[in-house]
Amino acid sequence: MTFRNCVAVDLGASSGRVMLARYQRECRSLTLREIHRFKNGLHSQNGYVTWNVDSLESAIRLGLNKVCEEGIRIDSIGIDTWGVDFVLLDQQGQRVGLPVAYRDSRSNGLMAQAQQQLGKRDIYQRSGIQFLPFNTLYQLRALTEQQPELIPHIAHALLMPDYFSYRLTGKMNWEYTNATTTQLVNINSDDWDESLLAWSGANKAWFGRPTHPGNVIGHWICPQGNEIPVVAVASHDTASAVIASPLNGSRAAYLSSGTWSLMGFESQTPFTNDTALAANITNEGGAEGRYRVLKNIMGLWLLQRVLQERQINDLPALIAATQALPACRFIINPNDDRFINPEAMCSEIQAACRETAQPIPESDAELARCIFDSLALLYADVLHELAQLRGEDFSQLHIVGGGCQNTLLNQLCADACGIRVIAGPVEASTLGNIGIQLMTLDELNNVDDFRQVVSTTANLTTFTPNPDSEIAHYVAQIHSTRQTKELCA
């Protein structure tokens, strides 16, 4: 029997993991084993919100060394992370400045400035990327305006997964799927857009041409002396998660559920018309030249902050208590910028309810109920927008990632969207990371081939919509009110 051992490093905003995958060629079976899991989070440093990249690198190396200590010969390594954030290096490869996180406030107001100076439609036609106040385009502008003393020292700008690959291999790479999240890549050329780069203040020489997933960046030399290839996977974690989504047919949508919720569909062509612009739809790069037509939703970040502030450790107990409460008493817009990084999330949620003359969620369960109901309703709105954009309804929604373990939210989503939900796999980003490695090793033909492997090996759970649920009735009432207003307009 022929086995391949691939290691996926999957870094999220709240945690990271080093996972070992074992693929058996003859029976096309794939198993995952967690080698090392570690925390990630935001830090305050010199007035900025930052990432501790040294700690993350140490955790990555610890995980890789653990695999080697077991006597396992690694065939390849791949790294995926969140998007938009970057690390600056000088000519010697040493860091310049701080690895500032996207939740820092330094780019506040710059998105509106870019739209005014360059034109909102022109930016969108060039990049195809949604307008988010922390996109790399605005972060770089903030850097060059606020810290001009750093500019003479900068030789390279590496996005997060490329930085960690560089630290392992000494080789630089700019992977395409993650590069597209910057709002700096031209959607027609797949290269950096000179007009957008010029506005950002960044030097084009800081960047190399983006490479599509599947190339070998370089090699990591393990403690035993073996040279192990480090593969440029679809290094944006959502791009990897979509690869592992067992999408079946053109009427399947996906929801990558974690700190962020990313809802969308796959397409061979981007959508950059006025309808897409008005809905703030993004066209991020995917594997094999596909586009991830999607929309960002704030996701479980709100819950993570509530858990932290209220010091809640028993999430299953909280969900059980939440399930016993009536639905849709407290509704907020999770995508409101006020929730990006407030000083106190609980107070911010309560203030939003107070300002809209709603009851105030006080208990832990009420806050969680507010978040779950609000997310499910926003999922329904976004799914409707996506269906209108492409001119065809969806028949099923695949929820992948850590958030798909929340059975209450899965059912609320099915009920609010009125669509069958298939939950799983949980470790979608890790699996998609592994999938590209196996293709690079010539073990699999393409993404569709890999999805067949996922469908037969992953644990999937189906949630059927209940039209008689409270949230389904709430959605029906909203639609009825909207139709009445449209008729009277």
From Swiss-Prot:
It comes from the Bacteria. Substrate binds at G83, H236, D237, T238, N296. CDD domains: ASKHA_NBD_FGGY_RhaB-like (cd07771). GO terms for cellular component: cytosol. Gene3D superfamilies: 3.30.420.40. GO terms for biological process: glycerol metabolic process; rhamnose catabolic process. Pathway: Carbohydrate degradation; L-rhamnose degradation; glycerone phosphate from L-rhamnose: step 2/3. ATP binds at A13, S14, S15, G16, R17, T259, Q304, G402. Its EC number is 2.7.1.5. It catalyses: L-rhamnulose + ATP = L-rhamnulose 1-phosphate + ADP + H(+). Keywords: ATP-binding, Disulfide bond, Kinase, Magnesium, Nucleotide-binding, Rhamnose metabolism, Transferase. GO terms for molecular function: ATP binding; glycerol kinase activity; rhamnulokinase activity. Disulfide bonds join C68-C222, C353-C370, C413-C417. NCBIfam families: PRK10640.1, rhamnulo_kin. Belongs to the rhamnulokinase family. Monomer. This is Rhamnulokinase. The gene is rhaB.
